[in-house]
Regions:
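Active-site neighborhood of glycoside hydrolase catalytic domains
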Residues: 8-97, 201, 240-241
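Long, low-complexity ectodomains and other extracytoplasmic segments of secretory-pathway proteins
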Residues: 239, 252-260, 343-366
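Aromatic-lined substrate-binding rim segments of carbohydrate-active enzymes
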Residues: 1-17, 83, 100-117
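Intrinsically disordered, low-complexity Pro/Gly/Ser/Thr-rich segments with frequent PxxP/GP/PP motifs
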Residues: 288-326, 394-420
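Short edge beta-strand/loop segments characteristic of extracellular beta-sandwich folds
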Residues: 270-276, 375-381, 415
Length: 442
C-alpha cells in the first residue's frame, strides 16, 4: 500500500505507472500463504478526516484520491488476483471517507496507550471490530546496542542513543511507564530489560482483552514485527533478528487455544478460554493465590468446553477475602491445561510490581546438549518473574521471559547453530535483579 501522501493524477502516464506498480506487486506477492488482504494505504483516509495539513486539501485532490484507491488500484489488483479481499485504507469503514475512525465498523488504529500515555488497562475501554494497529516501544537487545555504541554512549539520553530513537519524546515515555509499574532500574542493562518487559505486558493486555471479546472484535495486529536498522522502536524482533520479550509473549497470547484472566474490581478474576481451532476444546483451570515464597494459600479448579472459533467465559472467582490486607504479599496465578496438550499460565499482581514485596530469587539451571539441541532445566527457590535467559550465541528459545512460580523445574530448548562447538555461555536474570534492594533487611 501507499503511505500518508497523495499525488494529483494529472497525466495518463502517472495513472498507468500506478496501475503497473500495483500489478507488479500483486504478481510478486499473491502466492504468499500469509497474505490476508490487500490494503490501499496507511492512514490516509483518517489523516484527511482529522489531521492538520490534510483536511484543507482541495475537492479535486480528494476526487483523485478516490479514483486512485477506490478505482484504479482495486481494478488493477483484481486483474492479477481475483480472490484476495481489497480494503481501501487502514483505518477505514470501507471507503469514501465515511467515518474512517469508527469503533463500530471496519478497522481501527489505537495509540492512547503509548502516545497518549494512558495505562495498559485503557485497552479494556474499547471494543473495536478489528484493531489493526497499536503498539509500544522498547529498546533493542543489549548485544544490538553494543554494535552502534561505545561504553560511554550507553545512556538512553546520550547523543548516540537519541540518534537511534526517532520518536520524539519516546525515551521519556518509556521512563513514564517504568515509573507507573516498576522500581527504577539499577543500571543500563536493567533499563533495557525492563523496557522490553513493559512492551510485552502492554501488547499482551490489548490482545488478550480483544480476544476475550471475539465476535465483537475479530482481530488485533500490533505494530510492529521487525526493524530495518538498529534502533529503539515498536518492533518485537530487533534489526539483527534477536527476539525481544514481546516476541516470546506473542507465542502465548496468539496461541490457537488460550486461557486468560479478566481482572475486575473487588478482586474478581474471571478465566476465559479462547479457541481459534476448528475443533471443540476443553480446559481445566486452577486459580491459585500464592505468597512470595511460593506457598499456596488458596486454590480452586473448574473445567469448561469451548466450541470451534469461539470464546467461553468461566465462573468468576472472588478472591477479595483471601487477598485483602496482604495485597503486597501475594499474587494470583491461573494454570489452564487444554485438551490439545498445551498449557496457558497467567500471573496477576494485586498492585503494581513496584509495590509488591518480591523476594530475591536464586535461579539455577542445568544445561544439556544433544547434537544441536540445547536443553535448560530452570529452578528458582522463590517465585521469579519475567525470567530472561541470554547467551553469548544468538538463540531463539522455546520460551523466555517466563514466570518460575513452582518448585518443579521448567524446561526450555533452543537449536544451536552448526558452527557452535561445546556449551555456550548462558546467564539468567529476573525482575528482582533489575533494581537495587537490600534484601537483608526484608
Amino acid at each position: 500500500g501507499f503511505l500518508i501522501g497523495m499525488l494529483r493524477l494529472l497525466t495518463e502516464k502517472l495513472r498507468e505507472s500506478i496501475i503497473e506498480e500495483t500489478k507488479d506487486n500483486a504478481g510478486r506477492l499473491r502466492h504468499h500463504a500469509s497474505l490476508g488482504l490487500w490494503c490501499g494505504n496507511n492512514e490516509m483516509e483518517s489523516a484527511w478526516d482529522h489531521w492538520g495539513g490534510f483536511n484543507d486539501h482541495s475537492d479535486t485532490l480528494k476526487q483523485d484520491y478516490l479514483t486512485m484507491f477506490e478505482k484504479l488500484i482495486p481494478e488493477a489488483l483484481k486483474s492479477e488476483d481475483d480472490v484476495t479481499f481489497y480494503w481501501p485504507s487502514s483505518p477505514s469503514s470501507g471507503g469514501n471517507f465515511k467515518d474512517p475512525d469508527s469503533d463500530d465498523v471496519g478497522d481501527r488504529h489505537y495509540w492512547d496507550v503509548w502516545h497518549g500515555e494512558k495505562p495498559f488497562s485503557d485497552y479494556e475501554n474499547y471494543y473495536f471490530r478489528f484493531c489493526s494497529e497499536f503498539g509500544f516501544q522498547s529498546f533493542p537487545c543489549k548485544k544490538t546496542i553494543d554494535t552502534f555504541t561505545l561504553p560511554k554512549d550507553r545512556n538512553i539520553f546520550s547523543e548516540v542513543m537519541e540518534s537511534h530513537q526517532k520518536n520524539g519524546s519516546a525515551n521519556a515515555k518509556i521512563l513514564h511507564y517504568i515509573a507507573e509499574n516498576f522500581l527504577y532500574p539499577k543500571d543500563f542493562e536493567s533499563l533495557i530489560y525492563i523496557s522490553q518487559v513493559l512492551q510485552a505486558i502492554a501488547i499482551k493486555s490489548g490482545v488478550e482483552h480483544w480476544r476475550r471479546n471475539r465476535g465483537r472484535c475479530m482481530g488485533a495486529i500490533y505494530w510492529q514485527l521487525n526493524d530495518n536498522w538498529p534502533v529503539a522502536s515498536w518492533a518485537s524482533i530487533d534489526y539483527f533478528g534477536r527476539w525481544k520479550a514481546l516476541q516470546y509473549f506473542s507465542r502465548h497470547f496468539y496461541a490457537d487455544v488460550l486461557g486468560s484472566l479478566k481482572v475486575s474490581a473487588d478482586a474478581v478474576y474471571t478465566p476465559y478460554l479462547q479457541n481459534e481451532t476448528m475443533q471443540e476444546v476443553s480446559s481445566d483451570v486452577t486459580v491459585f493465590v500464592k505468597n512470595m515464597r511460593g506457598e499456596v494459600l488458596f486454590e480452586t479448579s473448574q473445567r469448561t468446553e469451548c466450541a470451534p472459533l469461539s470464546v467461553e467465559a468461566m465462573e468468576p472467582v472472588s478472591l477479595k477475602e483471601v487477598i485483602e490486607g496482604r495485597e503486597r504479599e501475594v499474587f494470583v496465578e491461573a494454570v489452564f491445561t487444554h485438551s490439545d496438550g498445551t498449557v496457558s499460565r497467567q500471573v496477576e499482581m494485586p498492585k503494581p510490581y513496584k509495590h509488591m514485596q518480591i523476594e530475591k530469587a536464586e535461579i539455577t539451571f542445568d544445561a544439556k546438549r544433544e547434537g544441536n539441541l540445547l536443553t535448560l532445566q530452570l529452578k528458582s527457590d522463590v517465585p521469579a518473574f519475567f525470567v530472561s535467559v541470554e547467551s553469548d550465541v544468538d538463540l531463539v528459545w522455546s520460551d523466555n521471559f517466563m514466570h518460575l512460580t513452582g518448585k518443579e523445574p521448567y524446561e526450555i530448548t533452543a537449536i544451536l547453530p552448526e558452527c557452535v562447538e561445546g556449551m555456550p555461555k548462558i546467564w539468567v536474570r529476573s525482575l528482582c535483579d533489575s533494581w537495587v534492594t537490600d534484601y537483608s533487611q526484608a
